[in-house]
């Protein structure tokens, strides 16, 4: 059975979609962009944006009673693959800090993202 996941701890959707959808032991998160839920601001640099996106993903997962180590796949969308080393540094630290293996991942450069952000990440997680 499908269950819509919605938490005020992470930014609300900016379009007609859910933050996440839980289906049995899976959770599928919509792409998250770096909006600070308290200030409603978007950081300027790619490092801060990457960290905030991952933080928002974690907040949605925790609300749904999942953890970072349950993530099995992410897709990273960025407007500048020349910044991949910075993205990878923050991404790697996030998973290590959360005592998690690295999930499967795709990374794609796109021309533009909503609200002119530099990064968006979607995730899928599974737990027994």
From Swiss-Prot:
InterPro entries: RidA, RutC-like_sf, YjgF/YER057c/UK114. One of its GO terms (cellular component) is cytosol. GO terms for molecular function: deaminase activity. Pfam families: Ribonuc_L-PSP (PF01042). It comes from the Bacteria. Belongs to the RutC family. PANTHER family: 2-IMINOBUTANOATE/2-IMINOPROPANOATE DEAMINASE RIDA, 2-IMINOBUTANOATE_2-IMINOPROPANOATE DEAMINASE. NCBIfam families: Rid family detoxifying hydrolase (TIGR00004). This is RutC family protein BU371.
